[in-house]
């Protein structure tokens, strides 16, 4: 009998320290905080920034046909002031305008300036075709000191038509041009507003002046308005330039009797390009696709916080300076006690800790994968990553950044220049609209990242649960869960046995008999906390009942012997 008790006690002692296999996940001592739909500041193992803040303070022009207009304004390439002589015809896929650039020489302005500027920025350059206009009875060599080359001159692409003699009669004229090309033609003309009525009479003769322009889609009449104005470049007169896009096979007709600045050549757009206003230096050693006034944004990120006004293939501008995208699982740093694997922690929390609700701590040493196993048996302790579950999670997380980029990237146009009086109202609307769009996209960006982060954390927890269920289904009744991500195995499980559990090749039938015997032996000597509680409550109840019975018996004896009297009053 004594021998049996000794053997049973020895067995109980051995299997309290039974072989174990635990499941866990990778952790780091210092993770990165991200926001999800339901919670802010969740720490994850890995995360990547989605907002670009690094600016290249140069115009990266490598691989591009770049035209730096310098002192020439972009609109000047159409009419031809002296500073634009080398850009009357050009080809480019990147057009750079400088702050010093000027569109005109004789003072004046363009009608619908910003619309024309946007057209030319995207033009890919321009080429010209002579319109074939000839004139009789007038002078075609009007010039001004405001447009100097070696001497007084005029716009290279325009003709300043004057009376044949000072104060002479300017004949009524009609000129037409048909666009025989397969692409639209840009037609530009001017209306001269003299500095005084006397000057207008000297240049174009007496009488009222009227200029009418029409095509199939356009009709407009202009009346010059002579009068004194502040002098600019020594001139008190002004020239207002007007333009239209003439469709193929359409004809434009000009009817005039003076004060008309006639077009000499029609302009044709070459293709496609980007145009940027910037004083940043050109750099042919770097490549870029996104530009702004301060330089180039080179980034594969979906968002940027550098400039709200950009052109090209650019990240979306958002107000946030940082939006972290989770690319790893929720981080639960390993507790110091788990690093030491003390006997106390083994007994209280299981061997290695855990995550995902039932696993309390991660493993900082698990560097080969996101998920893995740790085991303890007679041969010692070991750690191994689970590559299949790791790869499954990585495959689903990879591409999150690219998907964000696909949802957000598009070409943007830069509208950030001077507006005339009417266009200032449009400009205010554009600026208000842009600000509203920024607000919306800042919210959208935060929402998109939060959704992806929520999905990542839920996904990685799900993979952990799948791995746990795979082990539980293999072991069945051969092991018992300890509630901390570990399984206490009721048979001897060497390293090969542990490997079979990890590889999903474990044969529970092979160890079933040994496991059942050991489970019975353990249950015979080890009471669970539930049974202990039941016995304690039963014992307490029995003691109370016995005490009450003794007390009642004593009272009954005392009353019977007359030692105690009970009086009931009504």
Curated annotation (Swiss-Prot):
A single cellular component GO annotation: virion membrane
Membrane association type: Single-pass type I membrane protein
Disulfide pairings: 22-486, 60-286, 72-84, 105-147, 290-314, 493-497
One Gene Ontology molecular-function label: host cell surface receptor binding
Function: Binds to sialic acid-containing receptors on the cell surface, bringing about the attachment of the virus particle to the cell. This attachment induces virion internalization of about two third of the virus particles through clathrin-dependent endocytosis and about one third through a clathrin- and caveolin-independent pathway. Plays a major role in the determination of host range restriction and virulence. Class I viral fusion protein. Binds to sialic acid-containing receptors on the cell surface, bringing about the attachment of the virus particle to the cell. This attachment induces virion internalization either through clathrin-dependent endocytosis or through clathrin- and caveolin-independent pathway. Plays a major role in the determination of host range restriction and virulence. Class I viral fusion protein. Responsible for penetration of the virus into the cell cytoplasm by mediating the fusion of the membrane of the endocytosed virus particle with the endosomal membrane.
Protein name, as recorded: Hemagglutinin
Cytoplasmic side: 555-570
Topology feature Extracellular, residues: 19-533
Stored HAMAP family: INFV_HEMA
Subunit description: Homotrimer of disulfide-linked HA1-HA2.
Family: Belongs to the influenza viruses hemagglutinin family.
Secretion signal, residue range per the UniProt entry: 1-18
List of glycosylated residues: 30, 46, 249, 431, 503
Site-annotated residues for Cleavage: 349-350
GO biological process terms held by the UniProt record: clathrin-dependent endocytosis of virus by host cell; fusion of virus membrane with host endosome membrane; fusion of virus membrane with host plasma membrane; viral budding from plasma membrane; virion attachment to host cell
Keywords: Clathrin- and caveolin-independent endocytosis of virus by host, Clathrin-mediated endocytosis of virus by host, Disulfide bond, Fusion of virus membrane with host endosomal membrane, Fusion of virus membrane with host membrane, Glycoprotein, Hemagglutinin, Host cell membrane, Host membrane, Host-virus interaction, Lipoprotein, Membrane, Palmitate, Signal, Transmembrane, Transmembrane helix, Viral attachment to host cell, Viral envelope protein, Viral penetration into host cytoplasm, Virion, Virus endocytosis by host, Virus entry into host cell
UniProt-listed Pfam families: Hemagglutinin
More info: Major glycoprotein, comprises over 80% of the envelope proteins present in virus particle.
PTM notes: Palmitoylated.
Transmembrane segments: 534-554
InterPro entries: Capsid_hemagglutn, Hemagglutn_HA1_a/b_dom_sf, Hemagglutn_influenz_A, Hemagglutn_influenz_A/B
Location of this chain's protein in the cell: Virion membrane; Host apical cell membrane
S-palmitoyl cysteine: lipidated positions: 566, 569
Matches recorded under Gene3D superfamilies: 3.90.20.10, 3.90.209.20
